[in-house]
Amino acid sequence: VSVEGELGVLGGQEDHVFAATSTYTNPLDAVEFIQKTGVDALAISYGTQHGANKGKDAKLRREIPIAIKECINRLGIFCALVSHGSSTVPQYIVKEINDLGGDIQNAYGINVDELMAAIPCGIRKINVDTDIRLAVTRNMKELFANQPELRTSPSIGGVYALLEEKKSAFDPRVFFPPIMDTVLTGNVPDDDVALLMSRVEAGVKEAVGSLIVNFGSYGKAPLVEQKSLEDMIAFYKK
């Protein structure tokens, strides 16, 4: 099992836990944490923020991952640095949600150029869950707008009702209770649920696919070394 740690505090809200301010990660503390715990990855606080309200023109303190990377490289330690709270919050998706009856205000993310500049500084994993949530929510609203007969569907009509009731929400988990069995088990009871889930999948692909290209990861999957379970066991026994 790969283990990811986190050091520092990101402002914003994640899974109903809110922090009003950020505490930047001290590079020396990060190196000590990595040495003592042996984590495979470490999420750091260097200017990102959870949620869709990160403020305009957020700037990342790239000197923090640079310092950590330089120290662990000199010590011969491998640890991937992780960027939490890094959603870009595409403005076209926010606009489309609001045009479809949503009410998302003051939603701004991290500029893609800032994230691209952080990658050479040691960032190896970038979390963009808010982007995925926005794209999925937009797609569900769009589906019910284009096919109004689905609003009274016995299986997914409840999803539409929640979309209408909670106009400022964009976390799909808020809207999924009527189809929670499908979400948890993969069981698809009818064509309406299958159609809705296809829109969910398309939203995930849209959000992630564009960033894979921006971050320079397109076409690199074959370069990842494949390891068997036995190989992994042997590696982590060292």
What are these regions (language model features)?
Residues I104, D113-K238:
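C-terminal alpha-helical cap/extension of soluble enzyme domains
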Residues V1-A80, Q91-E96, L100-Y108, V112, ...:
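Alpha/beta enzyme core
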Residues S83-T88:
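Short catalytic/ligand-gating loop segments at beta-alpha or beta-beta junctions
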